[in-house]
């Protein structure tokens, strides 16, 4: 994956409002080699972002490389405004810090282990990191919507929030894990990313199409609802 220094810095909502470079989205990527998850404000990421998210790598959670062929978009979260998208990104990063640093021991106790006491893995892949990321996404979204100001809650939104998933299995049981009053009131939609193949070259095109879809919701695209 090509290093892009222009996306290495954290960008506030005011910057997105000014540039309109992408719609209010948060991108979540998973590593096909080790199973780790990376959060980004853009449909790409740099070494700086990897370094910030993986501050204490170890044998069970190695710092992943930027090789383009080992990263896949797990989901894209579409919010109603840039303030929400920035808050969601910040919440996800804070929860990652709690899991890996501030509350590392408590978090590690909840992870499935093998007979040697290591985080369970198959080959080198550890599925627990993706599962934790989905749980953190749900909790972060709840905080974003529940902490909205009274004025924001009374304002009729221009569009519904939505999540485009890599596959239905990745989001888990929709009725069990995503059935919350705040989600239902906002009409949170779960959709699937339509793929022809499974290659990194195609993925960049898909992410561009999702951005175009959210910028121009009336246009026809090849994204299917679940």
Curated annotation (Swiss-Prot):
Gene Ontology cellular-component annotations: mitochondrial inner membrane; mitochondrial large ribosomal subunit; mitochondrion; nucleus
Pfam families: Mhr1 (PF12829)
GO molecular function: DNA binding; DNA strand exchange activity; single-stranded DNA binding; structural constituent of ribosome
InterPro entries, sorted: Ribosomal_mL67 (IPR024629)
Other facts noted in the record for this chain: Present with 2610 molecules/cell in log phase SD medium.
Subunit structure: Component of the mitochondrial large ribosomal subunit (mt-LSU). Mature yeast 74S mitochondrial ribosomes consist of a small (37S) and a large (54S) subunit. The 37S small subunit contains a 15S ribosomal RNA (15S mt-rRNA) and 34 different proteins. The 54S large subunit contains a 21S rRNA (21S mt-rRNA) and 46 different proteins.
Sequence similarity: Belongs to the mitochondrion-specific ribosomal protein mL67 family.
Name of protein: Large ribosomal subunit protein mL67
Native source organism of the sequence: Saccharomyces cerevisiae (strain ATCC 204508 / S288c)
Gene expressing this chain: MHR1
